[in-house]
């Protein structure tokens, strides 16, 4: 009996030792992956096609050349995360389609970005081309290409497309949360055009001619397919994710749309917002927004009433308990790769636009965490570089080439 007990104790000790060895080995491998992820983030050019810094700063100014208290983007965090090119979103709320003034707001936001660059020439530079992005990367400067979120500032004047090209805009999201004079919106139940308007088609062709990327994020499904019929160049979804994980939500792209996007040479840039990534989180968030609206209406509160913020602080947690993490964001990247291949996906975080960032992707310092997750899933260095920037640069260069061919044929 004593011998049996001794043997059992010995076996237990050996098992504990093996478990400890396995844990040590896993920890060692994990550390290696983290180290490599950080190295690749500093080595590769990383592009994010949608960061809402301008609108964030217009009413709540902070110096993003230094560490800021608020927001997701500033220079120190961008450098820490390896972000080299951040498309500054010139975001125009949907209400300006009705009220007017969208063009003026776009000008103010572009001016704001230009002022930041002028005051910090050693840190930031506006990028007008793929060549600019590569040159700035080589010089250690963060590129600010400009994308206009909402075509409302075109204001029915085709010459305004050229106007915004000259101001530095290199992609235009045709609509936002409401249908406008160019296109129907995915969020809007009142579809005006059943796709693109006739003027929207003219605008897409003019964007092709000038070398402005057409962005299909926020568009209705019908509008997306209309864009593919009209555009002579590949298009992007600058900040969308996969509807496969958020069933029935038109703001994300379904599998057939992603296949068509890839067939036409385009790319989907994955949005990091938790509502875009996880359906349970999205539905809870919708319930919370409904509850908040009902509470405001019951108490007859005006916009920006301080009592609303107090209510949010007191009650939001119980509605928003589910946490989304960086691994789930990479699930979306995986889904696109498995569906259409490695060449059609990238980063479109929506930082400073979304508030519900995942654990491990809290701000622009966290891109190495995505690379770490990709390494864990056996993505090669070459594949990771394509996701970080290569795919987007390919599409942008093709848009530039299409523009050159069109203008050459005009001469």
Predicted features along the sequence, with ranges:
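Short hydrophobic/aromatic-enriched beta-strand-loop microsegments
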Residues: 234-240
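Bacterial N-terminal signal peptides
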Residues: 7-14
């Amino acid at each position: 009996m004593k011998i049996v007990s001794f043997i059992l104790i010995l076996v237990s000790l050996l098992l504990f030792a093996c478990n400890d060895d396995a844990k040590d080995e896993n920890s060692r491998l994990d550390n290696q992956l983290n180290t490599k992820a950080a190295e690749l983030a500093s080595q590769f050019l990383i592009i994010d096609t949608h960061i809402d810094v301008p609108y964030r700063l217009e009413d709540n100014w902070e110096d993003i050349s230094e560490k800021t208290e608020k927001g997701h983007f500033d220079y120190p965090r961008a450098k820490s995360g390896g972000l080299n090119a951040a498309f500054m979103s010139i975001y125009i709320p949907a209400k300006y389609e009705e009220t007017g003034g969208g063009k003026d707001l776009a000008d103010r936001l572009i001016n704001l970005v230009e002022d930041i660059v002028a005051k910090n020439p050693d840190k930031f530079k506006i990028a007008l081309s793929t060549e600019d992005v590569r040159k700035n990367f080589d010089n250690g400067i963060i590129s600010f290409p400009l994308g206009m979120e909402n075509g409302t500032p075109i204001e029915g004047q085709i010459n305004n497309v050229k106007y915004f090209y000259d101001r530095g805009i290199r992609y235009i999201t045709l609509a936002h949360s409401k249908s406008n004079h160019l296109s129907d919106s995915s969020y809007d139940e009142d579809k005006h055009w059943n796709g693109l308007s006739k003027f929207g088609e003219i605008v897409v062709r003019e964007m092709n001619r000038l070398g402005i990327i057409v962005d299909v994020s926020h568009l209705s499904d019908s509008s997306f397919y209309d864009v593919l019929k009209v555009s002579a160049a590949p298009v992007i979804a600058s900040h969308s994710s996969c509807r496969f994980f958020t069933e029935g939500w038109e703001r994300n792209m379904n599998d057939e749309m992603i296949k068509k996007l890839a067939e036409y040479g385009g790319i989907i840039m994955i949005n990091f917002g938790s509502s875009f990534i996880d359906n349970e989180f999205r539905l809870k968030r919708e319930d919370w927004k409904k509850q908040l609206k009902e509470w405001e209406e019951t108490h007859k509160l005006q916009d920006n009433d301080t009592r609303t913020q107090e209510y949010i602080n007191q009650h939001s947690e119980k509605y928003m308990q589910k946490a989304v993490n960086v691994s789930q964001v990479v699930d979306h990247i995986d889904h696109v790769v498995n569906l259409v291949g490695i060449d059609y996906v990238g980063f479109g975080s929506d930082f400073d636009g979304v508030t519900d960032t995942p654990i491990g992707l809290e701000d622009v310092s966290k891109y190495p965490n995505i690379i770490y997750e990709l390494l864990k899933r056996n993505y090669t260095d070459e594949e990771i570089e394509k996701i970080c920037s290569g795919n987007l640069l390919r599409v942008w260069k093709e848009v530039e080439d299409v523009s050159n061919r069109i203008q050459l044929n005009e001469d």
